[in-house]
């Protein structure tokens, strides 16, 4: 690979829960690399997503939403979020314009003040508020911290994304690319597969289930006809949650399986045979495999 004239930068995307971090990452990369659901705390581990623009490689770190942790799982999530701020060029502070008066956001700003990182303010969801509100939020955020640059976007509709990307490309330092031209993430394939199914679970059952469930891809096997056999286990903490996921006569888990299978086939471009199993494991949060979504 020719490194001459190439540029590369790494930016962590941080923010309060449900600010739209995973949606932004998917838009920046151009395809789905992170679960996007209406539930808070759907990002479990920090993940590198890669977007190449001519001679520039932009690496984005999708982090768990930063909040006040209580359980072991929550402490695991927040620890990984802060770890992502080490050895990077930029920290993108993503703010939901309708939820900017947020105590967790203030904690994020306080932490950044002591990091000496180039902090970029990005206001998301501008499509649902008046411009006067956007100006008010920018003024408030600059009263907390002097950001190097501010952008207004709608990650959902792709508004303002080009300006953000152009700025990141212009300010990226010269250096070798860290990932191959065709690589979009550093996450294992099994993790991607688990994320797809977990997303379907949260979208379908968001009013009935807590975020304390996990999907683990336990087996991926290629058949002679090049199709894939994928076996996944959905871990929940209560028997009642298992009943909800299974549904009457297994109809709910069948629906989720079909939706996940369809996405997997579109992404992988192969026929998929997906088998889902639901297990109750009261303290699954204490097991690494269940936290990260795949088993080796």
Swiss-Prot record:
PROSITE patterns: G_ERA, KH_TYPE_2. GTP binds at residues 15-22, 62-66, 124-127. Monomer. This is GTPase Era. It is a peripheral membrane protein. One of its GO terms (biological process) is ribosomal small subunit assembly. The lineage of its organism: Bacteria, Pseudomonadati, Pseudomonadota, Alphaproteobacteria, Rickettsiales. It is found in: Cytoplasm; Cell inner membrane. InterPro entries: G_ERA_dom (IPR030388), GTP-bd (IPR006073), GTPase_Era-like (IPR005662), KH_dom-like_a/b (IPR015946), KH_dom_type_2 (IPR004044), P-loop_NTPase (IPR027417), Small_GTP-bd (IPR005225). Residues 7-174 form the Era-type G domain. One of its GO terms (molecular function) is GTP binding. Residues 124-127 are annotated as: G4. Residues 41-45 are annotated as: G2. Residues 62-65 are annotated as: G3. Its main location: cytoplasm. Belongs to the TRAFAC class TrmE-Era-EngA-EngB-Septin-like GTPase superfamily. Era GTPase family. The keyword 4Fe-4S does not apply.
